[in-house]
Design a protein with these regions (language model features):
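Charged/polar low-complexity intrinsically disordered segments
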Residues: 5-7, 19
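A ubiquitous, low-specificity "background" feature that marks scattered single residues
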Residues: 13, 17, 148, 267-269
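Catalytic alpha-helical scaffold of carbohydrate-active enzymes acting on polysaccharides/glycoconjugates
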Residues: 17-160, 166-221, 228, 232, ...
């Protein structure tokens, strides 16, 4: 259960891009697992290495060329040109390890973004796991491990958490509060919110100090799922259409959180769709 609070998003750490009375908060999620190779019956007892290093490396190099490299270059240019532009990331620990293995230059490009002073990171389960549903101690361990990894690489201490696939319940809130986080990002699900808006700041009955930030699923999905679809009623989806939707919100709904996969730029929607010019 959630209830409305009077605070605005000025209290919360995820960074933002300002537009008139409203704030668009951009948060990009990045994750890649360590893929397992095909393990045949006759491999049992003979082959004890389970990872598909070839596919892992191929995926990282492909995503780097299609998304990470051009998107980071674009964001760095925007950060240098526009002093109000800010952005946040959720990088899983398993992705970071693979970037360190196969494309360390990508880590350096994220570090360049951080050096602008307007890039933040959210804490998440290190392995993008669903440990929060089954093992509280493992969940705590992965959150601490991820926070330490972010601190060691980027010199930034996350103050807001983001559970795997935005999973949330009151027990998760209590755990995150105990770990010292100030807020948690979760899905602004219509069937939970009912008449309430996802563009307001909430708290929970179980953990009042922990702020609850809600993803605007409607606007986020217009970019992530429908941007390049010819059969979408909003095609072509433009910046003007997004800003009209945001600026048409009630004045008290001052913050809109757009949370999506980073691969929306270049991998989900290729360069030819115009996603990098959005």
């Amino acid at each position: 259960m959630v209830r409305r609070r009077t605070q605005t998003f000025r209290y919360i750490q995820p960074l933002t891009f300002l537009k008139k009375m409203h704030t668009i908060t951009l948060i990009f999620n990045l994750h890649q697992p360590f893929r397992l190779k095909k393990y045949r019956f006759f491999d049992i007892g003979n082959d004890h290495y389970y990872y598909d290093d070839f596919e892992n490396e191929e995926v990282i190099h492909r995503n780097n060329s299609q998304t990470y490299e051009p998107a980071n270059r674009l964001l760095l240019d925007l950060l240098q040109k526009y002093p109000q532009f800010k952005v946040s990331f959720v990088l899983s620990g398993t992705l970071i390890e693979q970037l360190e293995l196969y494309t360390p230059e990508t880590i350096r490009s994220f570090q360049k973004l951080v050096q602008t002073g307007r890039v933040d990171f959210l804490a998440a389960p290190y392995a993008h796991s669903v440990a929060s549903l089954f093992d509280e101690k493992e969940f705590e361990y992965q959150m601490r491990l991820h926070t330490r990894k972010i601190q060691s690489l980027f010199g930034v201490e996350p103050s807001v958490a983001c559970n795997t696939e935005l999973i949330y319940n009151d027990e998760v809130a209590l755990t995150l509060e105990r770990l010292g986080y100030k807020g948690v990002l979760t899905e602004g699900a219509r069937h939970i919110l009912g008449w309430k808006s996802p563009n307001l700041l909430y708290t929970t009955a179980s953990s009042k100090p922990l702020k609850l930030l809600l993803r605007n699923s409607l606007l986020s999905d217009k970019l992530q799922a429908a941007f390049g679809r010819y059969d979408s009623p909003d095609y072509p989806y433009t910046v003007d259409k997004l800003l009209r939707a945001v600026n048409g919100l009630p004045e008290n709904e001052q913050s809109v959180i757009l949370y999506m996969d980073y691969e929306v730029m270049g991998t989900i929607w290729r360069d030819a769709t115009g996603i990098f010019d959005f």
